[in-house]
Structures are given as structure tokens and as C-alpha cells.
From Swiss-Prot:
The keyword Transcription does not apply. The keyword Transferase does not apply. This is Prolargin. Its main location: secreted. May anchor basement membranes to the underlying connective tissue. LRR repeats lie at residues 90-109, 110-133, 134-157, 158-178, 179-202, 203-228, 229-249, 250-273, 274-298, 299-318, 319-357, 358-377. GO terms for biological process: cellular senescence. Binds the basement membrane heparan sulfate proteoglycan perlecan and triple helical collagens type I and type II. Residues 1-21 form the signal peptide. Glycosylated; contains heparan sulfate. SUPFAM superfamilies: L domain-like. The gene is Prelp. It comes from Rattus norvegicus. Residues 22-61 are annotated as: Disordered. Keywords: Disulfide bond, Extracellular matrix, Glycoprotein, Heparan sulfate, Heparin-binding, Leucine-rich repeat, Proteoglycan, Repeat, Secreted, Signal.
């Protein structure tokens, strides 16, 4: 027994020495937990700063006119005109006194400095379309008594400019951000013939009973593509053309058009007009020549006058049409074509497609409107 113990003893010593030579296992490294990523949300797109704009075009060759701004063009054969359009301008140059026609469209102009116009008192025409103008200093317009044409389409105006010159004949302010019309802004514009306010943010509350007061000779009024629900009040009686497309108008007050003896053209496409909102004889106007009522909710063809030549009723809810009922003249016998053309309905073009009608065209319709050249169903 003792002999066997001594035999195992060397073996145990060898195993102990091998175990002592092995490296001890290192303690595990404790890593810090990674922070959870915070959710990211898309940031709103910021408008481009002026530094992002393309650089102005290099100045052209010297002009024959010493006072011609280098960034513009002064045509030798048209000394009263100054062309500064489409040149990536940020500022309006100094306008020479000899200039009557000023072209500044398609630039990046944000304001109209008084200094630029102080000597240009003879201006008659200014085109500022497609710029970035937010407001017009009334001191600029006050010093332009002869200005007749002011074009400021495609800018960032929020209200109609004040202190408009008395001799203004055309004022174009479409495709802006206009939601306000200052009181009395049109009161002295007796010579204004055209007022274009389409594609703005005009609502019913903007138009008061005296908004158009003073526009005694206005011939064309364009209020299309706004947010009107009612017909504008007190439209000047001299009006010839009225544009109200793409609003939300549902009703036309009874007798609304009776005070417009010269009204020849009405556009009211893309509204919410229905039979309920159209009193009888709403459009039976003596001098009306063209009537657009497409894309509404009309179920019956409205009464029209003898003189109407073009009628657009496409894309409505019309299911049937009775030529005898809509005929503006009481013709005793359809087969007897009267030689008095004044009493024959003048309708030449009738559009009815996009309704619930099917060919053929009713015979009584053709018998009434003998001058019809085109009918679209």
C-alpha cells in the first residue's frame, strides 16, 4: 500500500507543476451599454436664401446712352425703353429720367427703393412680373403720376398696393398672396380699365360695398381662382367682362346682372352653382354674348337672351334638354324663317358634353337656334 503511494507521488508533482504554468483566466471586460438612437424626424424644407440665387449676368457692352445702367439694355432705336428683364437682378437700378417703358420681369427683386425711381417721373409702363416683391412703398407710386400700366403678376404681395396713380389703366396682380384690399385703394382710379386679381387668397369678407367705388370705367374684372362663396358686391356697372372661375360660389342673387348694361362676357366655370342657386332669368341679359358655366351642378339649361352666341354647359348634371322651353323667342312657326334676323336667336356654339345627354340632338333645339354652327353632346 505504502509502495503504491510513493509510485503515484511523482505523477501528482508533475501534474501540479503543469497546472501552475498555465495562465490564469482574465476577468471578463464589462462594456458600457450603447445609447439607444433617438428617433429622427424630417425637418421642414427651408426656403432658399438669397445666396442660393444664380449670380447676376455680367454687364453688357457700353451703351450709346451714358445714363443707361450697365446691367440693363437701352435699345438705340427705342430711347424711352429700358430692358432689365431676365438678368438675375436683386435690386432695381437707378432709372434714367428719359425712360417711359421699364421691363424688370423675371428677376429676384424683393423691393422697390424710392432712390431708384426718384428721377423716373415720366414712367408709363412697368413690368415687374415674376419677382419676389412683398410690399410696395407708396412713396414710389406717388411720384409716378403718368403711370398707366403696372404689371406685378407672380410676386409675393399680400395686399393691393396703396397710392396707385390716378392715370392707371391696367393693374395686373395675379398669382400673388393677396388677402387684403385697403379701404379706398381704388377710389381715385377713374381711368382704370382692367383689374386682374386672379389666383390670390381673396375671400368674401375682403369685398365691402365700397371696395370698387371709383372704378367708373372698369371694363374687365378678373377674380378667378380665389376662395369666394358669394358674388362680389357693387361691381362697377360699366363692366364688359367678368371672370369668376374656380371659386366656391353656390348662389347668384336675383337680378344681380340687371345693372350691367354692357356685360358681354361671363366666366363662372368650376364653381358650385345648381338650379337652386340660379333664379329664373339670371343670365337673360340683353347684351350678353358669351356665357361659361362648365363644371358646375346645373340640371337644366338656364334661360338666355336672343343675342347670346356662345354657351358652355359641359360637365354639369343635365339629363334632358327641351328646345321649345329654352328658346328665347316665341316663334309662331318653325318652318317660317323670318327675314328679321334681329328676332332670331344668335346662338352659334353650344357645348353640352360631360352631362347625361345622348345623341341625337333634339329637333326642336335645331329649329329654334337656326344659326347654330356647332353642338357638342
Amino acid at each position: 500500500m505504502r509502495a503504491s503511494f510513493f509510485w503515484f507521488l511523482p505523477l501528482l508533482l508533475i501534474l501540479a507543476s503543469v497546472a501552475q504554468g498555465q495562465p490564469r483566466p482574465k476577468p471578463g471586460i464589462r462594456r458600457k451599454p450603447k445609447p439607444r438612437p433617438t428617433p429622427s424626424f424630417p425637418q421642414p424644407h427651408e426656403p432658399a436664401e438669397p445666396t442660393d440665387l444664380p449670380p447676376p449676368l455680367p454687364p453688357g457692352p457700353p451703351s450709346v446712352f451714358p445714363d443707361c445702367p450697365r446691367e440693363c439694355y437701352c435699345p438705340p432705336d427705342f430711347p424711352s425703353a429700358l430692358y432689365c428683364d431676365s438678368r438675375n437682378l436683386r435690386k432695381v437700378p437707378i432709372i434714367p429720367p428719359r425712360i417711359h417703358y421699364l421691363y424688370l420681369q423675371n428677376n429676384f427683386i424683393t423691393e422697390l427703393p424710392v432712390e431708384s425711381f426718384k428721377n423716373a417721373t415720366g414712367l408709363r409702363w412697368i413690368n415687374l412680373d415674376n419677382n419676389r416683391i412683398r410690399k410696395v412703398d407708396q412713396r414710389v407710386l406717388e411720384k409716378l403720376p403718368g403711370l398707366a400700366f403696372l404689371y406685378m403678376d407672380k410676386n409675393q404681395l399680400e395686399e393691393v398696393p396703396s397710392a396707385l396713380p390716378r392715370n392707371l389703366e391696367q393693374l395686373r396682380l395675379s398669382q400673388n398672396l393677396i388677402s387684403r384690399i385697403p379701404p379706398g385703394v381704388f377710389s381715385k382710379l377713374e381711368n382704370l380699365l382692367l383689374l386682374d386679381l386672379q389666383h390670390n387668397r381673396l375671400s368674401d369678407g375682403v369685398f365691402k360695398a365700397d371696395t370698387f367705388q371709383g372704378l367708373k370705367n372698369l371694363m374687365q374684372l378678373n377674380l378667378a381662382h380665389n376662395i369666394l362663396r358669394r358674388m362680389p358686391p357693387k361691381v362697377p356697372p360699366a363692366i364688359h367682362q367678368l371672370y369668376l372661375d374656380s371659386n366656391k360660389i353656390e348662389t347668384i342673387p336675383s337680378g344681380y346682372f340687371k345693372d350691367f348694361p354692357n356685360l358681354a362676357f361671363i366666366r363662372m366655370n368650376y364653381n358650385k352653382l345648381s338650379d337652386r342657386g340660379l333664379p329664373k332669368n339670371s343670365f337673360n341679359i340683353s347684351n350678353l354674348l358669351v356665357l361659361h358655366l362648365s363644371h358646375n351642378k346645373i340640371s337644366n339649361v338656364p334661360a338666355i337672351s336672343n343675342k347670346l352666341e356662345h354657351l358652355y354647359l359641359n360637365n354639369n348634371s343635365i339629363e334632358k334638354i327641351n328646345g321649345t322651353q329654352i328658346c328665347p323667342s316665341n316663334l309662331v312657326a318653325f318652318h317660317d324663317f323670318s327675314s328679321d334676323l334681329e328676332n332670331v336667336p344668335h346662338l352659334r356654339y353650344l357645348r353640352l358634353d360631360g352631362n347625361f345627354l345622348k345623341p341625337p340632338i333634339p329637333l326642336d333645339l335645331m329649329m329654334c337656334f337656326r344659326l347654330l354652327q356647332s353642338v357638342v353632346i
